[in-house]
Curated annotation (Swiss-Prot):
This is UDP-N-acetylmuramate--L-alanine ligase. It comes from the Bacteria. GO terms for biological process: cell division; cell wall organization; peptidoglycan biosynthetic process; regulation of cell shape. Keywords: ATP-binding, Cell cycle, Cell division, Cell shape, Cell wall biogenesis/degradation, Cytoplasm, Ligase, Nucleotide-binding, Peptidoglycan synthesis. The gene is murC. ATP binds at G130, T131, H132, G133, K134, T135, S136. One of its GO terms (cellular component) is cytoplasm. Pathway: Cell wall biogenesis; peptidoglycan biosynthesis. It is found in: Cytoplasm. It holds the Pfam family Mur_ligase_M. It catalyses: UDP-N-acetyl-alpha-D-muramate + L-alanine + ATP = UDP-N-acetyl-alpha-D-muramoyl-L-alanine + ADP + phosphate + H(+). Its main location: cytoplasm. Gene3D superfamilies: Mur ligase, C-terminal domain, Mur-like, catalytic domain, NAD(P)-binding Rossmann-like Domain. InterPro entries: Mur-like_cat_sf, Mur_ligase_C, Mur_ligase_C_dom_sf, Mur_ligase_cen, Mur_ligase_N, MurCDEF_pg_biosynth, UDP-N-AcMur_Ala_ligase_MurC.
Length: 501
């Protein structure tokens, strides 16, 4: 066996506790990715989830034993029972009957981040963190590396349009993943390259204070080993401040820090790896002019995904891919072929001159970025004469979590006001219990644009179809089941009389 084959076999080997695993909540974005990698590496996997889903069906097709509903008997889906039970920090209550049964049987209960950290061992790890943009940046990095001939393992929070999956066990030495800060789990990982897209107040239900939330990124940067690289966005005050705080001590340990951003950046606290000169929207993508810190002239990058924030995400991915040894021209070609991520400004369809998109945005800054990209799109089309009238942006927003809605209701209102017309649904509570007085109306009251509070989702399709005109862009937005409304809106548009373009 040659060295390459031996290395691949060593990276594929599973530790004893991960050879037969039961996963509680197996259909979730993070958990299903872990399950896919375990199955690819020869593990046996069982699991449970509250409902059937596309992810559950895909895992069954790959050999996982999955039960819908939660009960103690699910731990017997694998002959001999599991060697470990895997769960997440927040989504699964400790009273879950499968977790109770695992404790009764003395079966180790592992948290998802610890399992992902174990799967990364023996790899060169490229991790993307930040309050916003993790999934898109991670996905761009994966697609760029694949185009360059690498076969990285990866685990990402959304489904790559190119790969049709959110996780993969590759033959190469590189492992690319999101480092989720929401519950502090990014401190389980030891990155060789770390990207921080931005740092802004979030997840205060877990951290309790802005200071504690910010500190987790400092601690994450400190986990970089000698010879590693930290990539930070200099346009974002939070990540720029991170570079100022940790840059000197990382340099003492032989860790480089590179920044990316736009503008002059003359007072940047760290070397500028790449600078965005300009962004020009085009249809559902755009053209970026950028310049590397070690090159004398600008280059052009044509993206198929919209928004200036996506151009910055692409430049972060470019720096990380270069650090992995990929060829620059090939990286650019790979980024230009990036087709997006499931539920990230995803095109759903077009009817009667109205385009419908879907996006996962569930924080005010994310909402602002997506609506800004949509506004730039319709404005550019009007300048180009592509439409007989300038289209409007109509957003259907579903707040996610009662705690987040209570904290950010005013900020959500301000961000949503960037749209021309707003429909606000009630809160998608997910794991949380309802809070008195916290609902969609609380957000709607803070919107200054024309706004409609609609607590009945069954009426949204027809309502939005009645609001939209040819040339308009409709975006369903949120981390809950608002994603199901796109097809209903298209049905409503299809049923009404035909208009001009």
């Amino acid at each position: 066996m040659n060295d390459i084959a031996a290395g691949t076999e060593q990276r594929s080997a599973l530790p004893p506790e991960l050879r037969r695993v039961h996963m509680v909540g197996i259909g979730g974005a993070g958990m299903s990715g872990i399950a896919r990698i375990l199955l690819s590496r020869g593990g046996e996997v069982s699991g449970s989830d509250a409902k059937e889903s596309r992810g559950v069906l895909a895992l069954r097709a790959r050999g996982a034993q999955v039960r819908i509903g939660h009960d103690a008997g699910a731990l017997d889906l694998l002959p001999g029972g599991p060697t470990a039970v895997v769960t997440t920090y927040a989504a699964i209550p400790k009273t879950n009957p499968e977790l109770v049964e695992a404790q009764r049987r003395d079966i180790p209960v592992l948290l998802r981040p610890a399992v992902l950290a174990s799967l990364m061992r023996g790899h060169r790890t490229l991790l993307v963190s930040g309050t916003h943009g993790k999934t898109s940046t991670t996905s761009m990095l994966i697609v760029a590396l694949q185009h360059c001939g690498f076969d990285p393992s990866f685990a990402v929070g959304g489904e790559l349009n190119e790969a049709g999956t959110n996780a993969h066990h590759g033959t190469g030495e590189i492992f690319v993943a999101e480092a989720d800060e929401s519950d502090g789990s990014l401190l389980q990982y030891d990155p060789d390259v770390a990207v921080v897209t931005n740092i802004e107040s979030d997840h205060l239900d877990f951290f309790g204070s802005d200071a504690a939330y910010t500190q987790v990124f400092d601690d994450f940067a400190d986990r970089l080993a000698a010879g590693g690289l930290l990539v930070v966005c200099l346009d974002d005050p939070g990540s720029r401040a991170l570079a100022e705080r940790v840059g000197p001590r990382l340099a003492e340990r032989g860790v480089r820090v590179l920044g990316y951003g736009s503008g002059e950046l003359a007072d940047a606290p760290v070397p500028v790896g790449v600078r965005l000169h300009s962004w020009e929207p085009r249809d559902v993508g755009g053209v970026a002019q950028f310049q590397l810190g070690d090159e004398p002239a600008p280059r052009t990058l044509r993206l198929s995904v919209p928004g200036r924030h996506m151009a910055l995400n692409a430049l972060a991915a470019l720096l990380a891919a270069r650090a992995a040894g990929a060829d620059l021209d090939e990286i650019i070609q790979g980024l230009e072929g990036f087709g997006g991520v499931h539920r990230r400004f995803q095109f759903v369809g077009r009817e009667n001159g109205v385009r419908v998109f879907d996006d996962y945005a569930h924080h005010p800054t994310e909402v602002r970025a997506v609506l800004g990209a949509a506004a730039a799109l319709v404005e550019q089309e009007a300048r180009d004469g592509a439409r007989s009238r300038q289209g409007r942006v109509i957003v259907v927003f579903q707040p996610h979590l009662y705690s987040r809605t209570a904290t950010f209701a005013t900020e959500f209102g301000a961000a949503l006001s960037l749209a021309d017309e707003v429909v606000v649904l009630d809160v998608y509570g997910a794991r949380e219990k309802a809070m008195p007085g916290v609902n969609g109306a609380l957000v709607a009251q803070a919107v200054t644009a024309p706004v409609h509070y609609q607590p009945d989702m069954s009426r949204v399709g027809r309502q939005v179809a009645g609001l939209a005109l040819p040339g308009d862009v409709v975006i369903t937005m949120g981390a809950g089941d608002v994603t199901m409304l796109g097809s209903q809106i298209l049905d409503g548009l299809r049923a009404r009389p035909q208009h001009g373009r």
